[in-house]
């Protein structure tokens, strides 16, 4: 299985949408692994948690460090058993079947999937047959959706037109973008990023410490630093502009 190419159109947008939808200041390693699994299922490519975490950081998201994760429930012996099983039966069993076969069935399929992702051995797992996709939009509605986007309708307007929520419309737009049926994502009038920006509106940031901003906004200090870095803003004791410049430089170097 080939590795996911972040330069493929729509892939980075999908990643950012998934991360933003979490609505958290700091994305946990567990959430990173879940996003990796979702992208792997959607693209049919090999996607590791490490690559997802790295890409999220380059896009300005705050991601929990791997060494901050609590001790694994897997013992060294259980991990070795899993690795041996994967090496001996590469590509023969699904996550659910592996879960039943190793460690006395102690771990569920999701736990086994997360562990295999962390070991970067997903290529040794038999792909689970995809269930037939349930159509949430009829062919006529899809055509109407495309016409709405071409006409410049916002996500909110499209949601109102079809009587769906923002998440459903965003998901359908991403799907149509990957299929090449629309050239770009429709604009969202009120994004979560705008909401976060509004939290800082009216604050004299350059004369306030991170702790003071955290108290005013109800966010954690780490969350405040993430907001400042993402927008390139400067506080009394934190230079978000410099952090933003470093992130942009890393992203440019990776392309």
Curated annotation (Swiss-Prot):
Domain of life of the organism encoding this protein: Viruses
Keywords in alphabetical order: DNA-binding, Transcription, Transcription regulation
GO MF annotations, alphabetized: DNA binding
Function of the molecule: Putative transcription factor required for the expression of viral late genes.
Name of the protein: Putative transcription factor D5
Source organism: Escherichia phage T5 (Enterobacteria phage T5)
Taxonomic path: Viruses, Duplodnaviria, Heunggongvirae, Uroviricota, Caudoviricetes
Gene behind this protein: D5
